[in-house]
Amino acid sequence: MEKLHFKEMGSGQKIVIIHGLLGSSDNWITIGKKLSENFHVYLVDLINHGNSPHTEIFNYFRMADDLYNFFHFNNINKAHLIAHSMGGKVAMKFADIYQNHIDKLIIVDIVNKGYPTNRFNYIFNALKNIKTKNIKSRKDADQHFSNYINNLSERNFLLKNLK
């Protein structure tokens, strides 16, 4: 059980927001700030994303349990849950298991169906084949990613996650 990293703002009814694959809480900061004018907002980094711990166990059941523990550690009995893409899959699993903890469920850009498991292989190949000792700058990383990923926006999204 890992403690998830999060950003917190505002007061009132609680809203928990979860990012998508390869994203982080930073993806929702603008919307979170706006919502915090009327709500108590939590922007959560799922495991293996953002500033949350990294682990080899990575599946929807595990992430739903991590989210349950996040609710517990932060004394959240019930909240509105907003989730994007892969985070939406986590939120749906959470709602299935822990429905009493959800007030409203808002899923963005994903449906409850199976998707091809190879859909993002080109991105995972780029990440798997990076030689970190050869990367001295974001430009070096972008050059590596460009061998696998043609779309500049996708490369920039990956580059945002570099530390």
Residue ranges, per PLM feature:
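Active-site glycine-rich loops that stabilize anionic/oxyanionic intermediates
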Residues: 12, 20-23, 85
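Alpha/beta-hydrolase active-site loop signature
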Residues: 22, 46-50, 112
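Alpha/beta-hydrolase fold catalytic core
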Residues: 1-15, 36-39, 76-77
